[in-house]
Amino acid sequence: MPCQDTVSLSIQHTHVIIQNSCCTTVSTSASTSATAYGLGCLALGCAGIAAAGICICCLIHGCPACPRRLGVRKQSSLSKQGHVSFHHLNPSDRVSRPYHPSCPTDVDLYLGGVQHDPDYVSHAQPIETQPQPLPPPPAYS
């Protein structure tokens, strides 16, 4: 038999089950072989599937290397309908919430604003009390 460029794989798995003093053997085996030509076709197929997946991902989610406006032509029909303007929000357009002393902001917490909270300060101050004597140990009879 002449030597060929063949890759083969054989797997055998034997599982012995002992149940109620009865030995049952389950054996499975699988084997496959492929020539170099088959491996080349398999590699090309995997590469094609990977390339198609990357293209679909770029089309759906956008690719950082690709421009975002692939489907928009510079001279499109939008210029006939009207002017489209892109503006950025001004600082006055931002939503602001009123400051409430019982709800410190993140900046206040970062700068130590919680230490200026009256509840925090009252608990942090030392409590002056007199030491209490320990009770006598229990009497054993």
UniProtKB/Swiss-Prot annotation:
This is Non-structural protein 5. Disulfide bonds: none annotated. GO terms for cellular component: host cell membrane; membrane. It is a single-pass membrane protein. Keywords: Host membrane, Membrane, Transmembrane, Transmembrane helix. Its main location: host cell. The keyword Membrane applies. It comes from the Viruses. It is found in: Host membrane. Belongs to the aquareoviridae NS5 protein family. The chain crosses the membrane at residues 40-60.
